[in-house]
């Protein structure tokens, strides 16, 4: 304190002692006591020194107040810092933000057991475990949570067999031929009907009498319509009958129709040599025709010569024609197998009955079915792989197909999921088919070597 010794009193000494002990709370009290004592001393002092002493006492208390406040503030800060260090931190697990997050799900335990139980206690068994065993015992793993579509089909590759060299490259054409009549190839038709006329220039330059037609002619007729010899085929027109002129006649009333021609043959049969009313020229001509047919030279006769002999006035009688044709068939069937002769004779009988019924379309279908049933035409189309004409109804989630490699045919199917996965699955199937075909080729080659 900057107060002179002569101005100190007993009251000031007590206030200073208290301020040293409690500087925070007793600062104002000491200042007030000092002011009161100074005022009393000024009143008792002489008038000359009153002004200077008053000014000195007013300036000293302001400096003491600011210094004490700064010291008290520093002491309070140090005390609070010590209290914070001494106080322990709160547990972060009990914070409000973490309390809002739910506990993680135990998917591994819940997926391996189909029965409800208390997961916290660790007891996953239930009262139904005796009746329904858990899935974990059956070695079945459930799909992950992100998989929502489960397929019922599994990828499969099946070996169908080995295709012959004469089989068509288009193995399964059921989708292309659906709703269309079946048209056999040229070799099959010629084998079933050996005397059917055929235009040899219809498929030039792709014509091959013993092979398969080109791809653009598979579903098209490759031969002229079948005409029962010696019936001539009348011209057909696409103009409706109502728009034709007065001279035009419908095809049914034409002189080339089957009914009128059959009536002419019946009328001519009365002049046959069997009835005894035929002329000598007709008898000689019939004998020459039968002699030529027995040798087989009539089969090589040109179409112009045959048509010239079939004039309306010189028609061959029905009985004589049947006799000649039977002789021709018997001569030609000697060089054929037993099965082919049986099918040919049966088809001939059916053709003979169909002439009297005037149903050529039905006759052709019956003859074809008969040849297939008897096995007279052992072609690979009917014997090797029999394909159904009905289209296969595929599931929208299942892809099916066939792969032919080195005359080996493989069928495959796998479920559809996505474009990338489907492509990888197909490529893996192609790799498997490639490896299997190589193994089959090696086995077949080794088998041929051991057989030789």
From Swiss-Prot:
Acidic residues: bias regions: 61-77, 362-372
GO biological process: one example: negative regulation of mating-type specific transcription, DNA-templated
Composition bias type Basic and acidic residues, residue spans: 349-361
Ranges annotated as biased composition (Polar residues): 12-22, 35-53, 107-116, 124-145, 269-281, 291-307
Coiled coil ranges: none
Biased composition (Basic residues): 81-100
Ranges of biased composition (kind: Low complexity): 331-348, 378-395
Cellular component, GO annotation: nucleus; Ste12p-Dig1p-Dig2p complex; Tec1p-Ste12p-Dig1p complex
Start and end residues of each stretch annotated as Interaction with FUS3 and KSS1: 212-452
Residue span of region Disordered: 1-145, 262-311, 331-395
Modification type Phosphothreonine: residues: 379
Statement: the UniProt record of this protein carries the keyword Transport: no
Entry keywords, A to Z: Nucleus, Phosphoprotein
Modifications made to the protein after synthesis: Phosphorylated by FUS3 and KSS1, in a pheromone-stimulated manner. Phosphorylation reduces the affinity for STE12.
Subcellular localization(s) per the UniProt record: Nucleus
Function according to Swiss-Prot or TrEMBL: DIG1 and DIG2 are negative regulators of the filamentation and pheromone induced mating program. DIG1 and DIG2 inhibit the transcriptional activity of STE12 by direct protein-protein interaction. DIG1 colocalizes to promoters with STE12 and redistributes with it during induction of filamentation (by butanol) or mating (by pheromone) to program specific genes, but binding of DIG1 to STE12 is reduced by pheromone treatment.
Subunit composition and interactions: Forms a complex with DIG2, STE12 and either FUS3 or KSS1. The interaction of FUS3 with STE12 depends on the presence of both DIG1 and DIG2. STE12 is lost from FUS3/DIG1/DIG2 complex after pheromone treatment. DIG1 and DIG2 have also been reported to interact with CLN1 and CLN2.
Further information: Present with 5000 molecules/cell in log phase SD medium (5480 according to TAP-tag study).
Name under which the protein is recorded: Down-regulator of invasive growth 1
Organism: Saccharomyces cerevisiae (strain ATCC 204508 / S288c) (Baker's yeast)
Source taxonomy: Eukaryota, Fungi, Dikarya, Ascomycota, Saccharomycotina
Gene: DIG1
């Amino acid at each position: 304190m900057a107060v002179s010794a002569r101005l100190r009193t007993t009251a000031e000494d007590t206030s200073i002692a208290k301020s040293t002990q409690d500087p925070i709370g007793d600062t104002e009290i000491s200042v007030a006591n000092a002011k009161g004592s100074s005022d009393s001393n000024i009143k008792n002092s002489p008038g000359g020194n009153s002004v200077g002493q008053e000014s000195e006492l007013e300036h000293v208390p302001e400096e003491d107040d600011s210094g004490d406040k700064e010291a008290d503030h520093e002491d309070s800060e140090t005390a609070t810092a010590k209290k914070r260090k001494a106080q322990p931190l709160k547990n972060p697990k009990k914070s409000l933000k973490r309390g809002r997050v739910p506990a993680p799900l135990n998917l591994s335990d819940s997926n391996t057991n189909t029965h409800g139980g208390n997961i916290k206690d660790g007891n996953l068994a239930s009262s139904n475990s005796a009746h329904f065993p858990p899935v974990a015992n059956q070695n079945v793993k459930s799909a992950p949570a992100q998989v929502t579509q489960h397929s019922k089909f599994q990828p499969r590759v099946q070996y169908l067999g080995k295709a012959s060299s004469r089989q068509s490259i288009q193995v399964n054409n059921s989708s292309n031929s659906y709703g269309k009549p079946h048209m056999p190839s040229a070799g099959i038709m010629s084998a079933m009907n050996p005397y059917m006329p055929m235009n040899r220039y219809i498929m030039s330059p792709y014509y091959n009498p013993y092979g398969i037609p080109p791809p653009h002619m598979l579903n098209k007729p490759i031969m002229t319509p079948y005409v029962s010899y010696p019936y001539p085929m009348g011209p057909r027109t696409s103009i409706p009958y109502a728009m034709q002129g007065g001279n035009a006649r419908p095809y049914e009333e034409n002189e080339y129709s089957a009914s009128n021609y059959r009536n002419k043959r019946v009328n001519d049969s009365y002049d046959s040599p069997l009835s005894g009313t035929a002329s000598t020229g007709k008898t000689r001509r019939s004998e020459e025709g039968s002699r030529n047919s027995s040798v087989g030279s009539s089969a090589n006769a040109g179409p112009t010569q045959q048509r010239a002999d079939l004039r309306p006035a010189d028609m061959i009688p029905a009985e004589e024609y049947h006799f000649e044709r039977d002789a021709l068939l018997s001569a030609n069937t000697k060089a054929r197998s037993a099965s082919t002769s049986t099918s040919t004779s049966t088809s001939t009988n059916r053709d003979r009955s169909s002439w009297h019924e005037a149903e050529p379309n039905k006759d052709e279908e019956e003859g074809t079915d008969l040849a297939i049933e008897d096995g007279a035409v052992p072609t690979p189309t009917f014997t090797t792989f029999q394909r159904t004409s009905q289209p296969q109804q595929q599931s929208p989630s299942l892809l099916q197909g066939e792969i032919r490699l080195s005359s080996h045919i493989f069928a495959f199917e796998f479920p559809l999921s996505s474009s990338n996965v489907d492509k990888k699955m197909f490529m893996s199937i192609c790799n498997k088919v490639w490896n299997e075909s190589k193994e089959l080729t090696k086995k077949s080659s080794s088998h041929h070597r051991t057989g030789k």
